[in-house]
Amino acid sequence: MAKVCYSCGKGPSFGNARSHSLRATRRRWNPNLQKVRIREGGATKRVWVCASCLKGFKVQKAVRPVPAAEA
């Protein structure tokens, strides 16, 4: 599976790196992808999500249950 955002589908973009003499060489710009655990359909899964989707709360992160304190 390619490294693309699970939420928005953002992947690498391609273009040219330009030197001072304007010689063009191909390069790629990668999105800021983070591997996070999300809840989906009652199940927890680890997926790649871009930082802008995490900041915009477009995915629901999974939280680990806190064990009950013994009294």
Curated annotation (Swiss-Prot):
An example molecular function term from Gene Ontology annotations: structural constituent of ribosome
Cross-referenced Pfam families: Ribosomal_L28
Keyword Transmembrane applies: no
InterPro entries per the UniProt record, alphabetical: Bacterial_rp_bL28, Ribosomal_bL28, Ribosomal_bL28/bL31-like_sf, Ribosomal_bL28_bact-type, Ribosomal_bL28_sf
One GO process term, biological-process aspect: translation
Any single Gene Ontology cellular-component annotation: ribonucleoprotein complex
Family: Belongs to the bacterial ribosomal protein bL28 family.
Entries under PANTHER family matching the protein: 50S RIBOSOMAL PROTEIN L28, LARGE RIBOSOMAL SUBUNIT PROTEIN BL28A
Protein name, as recorded: Large ribosomal subunit protein bL28
Organism per entry: Rubrobacter xylanophilus (strain DSM 9941 / JCM 11954 / NBRC 16129 / PRD-1)
Organism ancestry: Bacteria, Bacillati, Actinomycetota, Rubrobacteria, Rubrobacterales
